Amino acid sequence: MSIQAKKLNYTYQIGTPLEHIALKDVSINIKDGSYTAIVGHTGSGKSTLLQHLNGLLKPTSGEISINGYTIDNTTKNKELGKLRKEVGFVFQFPEAQLFEETVLKDIAFAPKNFGKSEDEAEKIAREKAKLVALPEEVLEKSPFELSGGQMRRVAIAGILAMEPKVLVLDEPTAGLDPEGRHQMMEMFNRLHKDENLTIILVTHQMNDVAEYADHVIVLESGKVIADSTPKELFSDPEWLKNHHLNLPQTTDFAYKLFDKLALSKHSLPLKSEELTDEILKILGGNLNE
């Protein structure tokens, strides 16, 4: 399921004193099966762009196409039902959307709503609960008896129960402690690989961009100012500094180390294991001298 935006523009509250242009000529291409990170400061247009991905917002001008579904300013809401089944959204604090008596019923709600029988919906719910590592014994409990991390997994399982092809993550680890954040990001990465889900992640965490994404889009004042791989983006620290973006911790450490040792020909590490390999190469070279 590829996603293409062509000269996408969006303006809030047109014709009022509060009129605000949120997106300006945005053209992007997100490939099927990719893990795309969208980064930028507050007010850059990230959330506005996300809301175009399943028709929560429709362009003021331009268009966005998702697996053959094209949305423009003439698209009727009744035409968006199938698309919304294929694009699952995980907003910040998705556990706020829980409402059913039991975990199982909450996860099964979406497939039942899309026409599955009760037995079919329950089967899907149990499968998705396993995918997000929810133990069997919690399925008959109230979701409100669970820990915050488990409640979030219930909400995500409910989104997966729609069987989307694209999973859109808007700061999905907000409010979690470091261990919970790591577990959640590893879970999304596993879903990306094992379920062949296209992932679109909005984040301020450059470490997550480096660790998980294969494609990164940078927005600033409603415009796309970079569209590249993480390695390309993080290879220009001066550009990042000028746009008030940080390096991942591993890459930042590598730059400082290479500067200290007056080295410039080593490949850029994004992940901790890549940094370890580079350090071993350096040590090996020094030992051979």
UniProtKB/Swiss-Prot annotation:
EC id: 7.-.-.-
Q: Provide the topology term for how it sits in the membrane.
A: Peripheral membrane protein
Q: Where in the cell is it found?
A: Cell membrane
> Which GO terms fall under molecular function for this chain's record?
ATP binding; ATP hydrolysis activity; ATPase-coupled transmembrane transporter activity
Q: What class of enzyme is it?
A: translocase
Q: Does the keyword Transport apply?
A: yes
Cross-referenced SMART domains: AAA
Q: What GO cellular component term, any one, is given? A: ATP-binding cassette (ABC) transporter complex
Which PROSITE patterns does the record associate with it?
ABC_TRANSPORTER_1, ABC_TRANSPORTER_2, CBIO
Q: Which Pfam families match?
A: ABC_tran (PF00005)
User: Quaternary form?
Assistant: Forms a stable energy-coupling factor (ECF) transporter complex composed of 2 membrane-embedded substrate-binding proteins (S component), 2 ATP-binding proteins (A component) and 2 transmembrane proteins (T component).
Alphabetized PANTHER family for the sequence: ENERGY-COUPLING FACTOR TRANSPORTER ATP-BINDING PROTEIN ECFA2, HEAVY METAL TRANSPORTER
Family stated for the protein in its record: Belongs to the ABC transporter superfamily. Energy-coupling factor EcfA family.
Name the UniProt record assigns to this protein: Energy-coupling factor transporter ATP-binding protein EcfA2
Q: What is the lineage of its organism?
A: Bacteria, Bacillati, Bacillota, Bacilli, Lactobacillales
Q: Which gene encodes it?
A: ecfA2
